[in-house]
Design a protein with these regions (language model features):
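Active-site PLP attachment segment
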Residues: 192-230
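Buried hydrophobic packing segments
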Residues: 62-67, 88, 213, 259
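Structural detector of well-ordered beta-strand residues that form the stable sheet scaffold
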Residues: 54, 79, 100, 168-169, ...
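Conserved active-site segment immediately N-terminal to the catalytic lysine
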Residues: 170-207, 238-241, 291
């Protein structure tokens, strides 16, 4: 096969996109104003079941601003996963706060048991605030990442947040479309359970605006402050009065014009991802040494990324060797992210219970999962996975 099978490429229906972009360009509103921004915000809000959403420049911009509005201050600590992309952690540092890394469970999300153990054994409560015994710093928030479209255990997490009095920011940048089907939060979408949620529309996400992100919350005052800060904290729209330091984090009308057509196709994209996941699952179950990681059974995931665990002893090669073979076969794949507590800027930061994260880091590959992946291409990937086994 001469062509390359991409890992997670945009699925772009050209006709409606071009129609929207033409309307956007002809209107002259191509920058940070125009009707498509409001239209896209309304569609996202309706889809995930909140009253309002605020479009921003990127998922990172959304996380940065949300942490500020949630009250994270210099000297505070924010609990974060180590198994994630670094963009989920850097915004903590932007505020002069310190990330504390917590390990994962088999969902690849933060382990609620480890989280509880850390809070009970490594922290103390004083004046209704939780402090890290080791550093005497306030635990201001938890930034929880719903990894690869799976869902962290939000029931446990919200119970702990209430008991230990910290804010919960849901990094749902990978999980737009994932929702609970059972339990206390049945029907609730990733990003809508904590104090705030953030989505990303980067090119490899399940829907894209090229870049861009969205902040959601059920707290109107919070969203008003997000909108205010991301538009340069302009107090007077006519006379350019600014009472605070804000950010140029606004979404472009051009981006939103693309997004309004993409969101209409989201459920169709997820249906394709479910079909391809099941195709992989049936085949990989019969390849000794490979395991396709499951998603939680109490959710409808968006199946954003498919994760294969490579058992070197049984498969005959490790995940790095398999990655190289797949790339040589024109199959784009990637290792899981480098653990953040091991990255140079964060090596001196506290990391708690990260052994399982290390285990998965050493064994996981992501295989092609685009929402326009054909059955033929998926079968080619499967064929090569079988062929490469030693």
């Amino acid at each position: 096969m001469a062509k390359t099978i991409g890992l997670s490429i945009p699925n772009l229906d050209v006709e409606p996109i071009v129609q929207n972009l033409r309307e956007c360009i002809e209107s002259g509103w191509v920058s940070t104003g125009g009707k498509f921004i409001g239209d896209f915000e309304e569609k996202i809000a309706k889809y995930v079941g909140v009253k309002e959403a605020v479009g921003v420049q990127s998922g990172t911009a959304g996380l940065h601003t949300a942490l500020r509005v949630l009250g994270v201050e210099p000297g505070d600590e924010v609990l974060v996963p180590t198994l994630t992309f670094i963009a989920a952690v850097n915004p903590v540092t932007y505020h002069g706060a310190t990330p504390v890394f917590i390990g994962c469970d088999d969902t690849l999300c933060i382990d609620p048991n480890l989280l509880e153990k850390f809070l009970r054994e490594e922290c103390t409560i004083k004046d209704e605030k939780t402090y890290n015994k080791k550093t005497n710093s306030r635990i201001a928030a938890l930034a929880i990442v719903h990894v690869f479209g799976n869902m962290a255990n939000m029931e446990r997490i919200m119970e702990l947040a209430r008991e230990f009095n910290f804010k919960v920011l849901e990094d749902a940048t990978e999980a737009l479309g994932t929702y609970y089907t059972e339990g206390r939060y049945a029907g609730k979408y990733a990003g809508t359970i904590g104090d705030a949620g953030v989505y990303s529309f980067n090119a490899n996400k399940i829907i894209t605006t090229g870049g861009g992100g969205m902040v959601v919350s059920n707290n109107q005052e919070f969203l008003d402050e997000i909108r205010f800060l991301t538009t340069q904290a302009k107090t007077d729209q006519l006379y350019f009065i600014h009472d605070e330091i804000g950010y140029n984090y606004r979404m472009l009308n051009l981006q939103a014009a693309l997004g309004t057509s993409q969101i209409d196709q989201l459920e169709s994209f997820i249906s394709t991802k479910i079909k391809n996941y099941n195709l992989y699952k049936e085949a990989i179950e019969n390849i000794d040494g490979l395991t396709l990681l499951p998603f939680n059974t109490d959710i409808r995931p968006n199946y954003w990324f498919y994760s294969v665990v490579v058992d070197e002893e049984k498969y005959g090669m490790n995940k790095d060797e398999l990655l190289k073979k797949l790339v040589e076969a024109n199959i784009q794949t990637r290792p899981i992210w480098g653990l953040i507590h091991e990255q140079k800027p964060y090596q001196k930061h506290q990391a708690y219970g990260v052994e399982k994260a290390v285990w998965y880091h050493d064994r996981v590959l992501n295989i092609p999962c685009s929402s326009n992946l054909t059955e033929e291409d998926a079968k080619y990937v499967i064929e090569k996975l079988k062929e490469f086994k030693r």
